[in-house]
Amino acid sequence: MMKLFRVIGYFSQLRAFIGFKATCTFTLAYIRNKISPPQESALAHIPVGPYVFYFPSISYFDGLFSEIFFKETYIIPYTDAPIRVIDCGANIGMSLLYIKIRAPHAQVMCFEPNPAARLVLEKNISENNWGEDVQIFPYALGKEKGITEFFVEDKVATSSGGSIVNHLEKRGRSLNSYSVEVDTLSHYIESKVDFLKIDIEGPELGVLEELVAQQKLRSVAEIQLEYHYIPGFFTRPLSEMLSLLEKNGFHTFVEPTAPPHHVVGHET
């Protein structure tokens, strides 16, 4: 019974995003993918409102879609304005899908160093004709430019948990690694940024410190980020990040979830 109530609740939430008819279409396509999943290495797809979203497996879709649409990880009010958004850690494009549903004319910069995830991201951009509005940059982000190894789970090539540190190996996970370029974010910010999303599995504080050093954080109106404390690798406390943001004119909201997400915005 509780599961039925949860499904009804999810249906109502999605209807608020894309309308009743589109939610029915989505539900039928979702059930088809559950019953008859795509062959290994083939991409599945589901219509989500006016768009079609491609993904490697229904279980992978479940996790990302639930986090972003049902748990409402991101909060962007609906707007027709061409807002400027930076998506750090775009993965296969689920956050981009949310952005485009909430702000259809948004101009978005996507950063994604994982080549497998980036291929699916490119597919979603191409199939939905977002090419004029969306740019992809194949870089990891950090406090300094350079070259580093990027680690991804062997069993999930598109994993959203890819990181520049191999902390998952200590948990017994088998990892693949790629050599990737690390870039700094500041020189991509030349004018106001309406929304900055950061989910990069560890180096969040370094990215923000670089923006402060280059006097670019003041150009950002709102930030949502996922803070990662990774023992042995990224161990600076959350209080340092909150202090940095507050010193630069933001007020902060901390939402403890698993993993924790944090929404911050300028004081008014």
What residue spans do the PLM features occupy?
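Phosphate/nucleotide-binding beta-alpha loop and adjacent structural elements of enzyme active sites
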Residues: 1-268
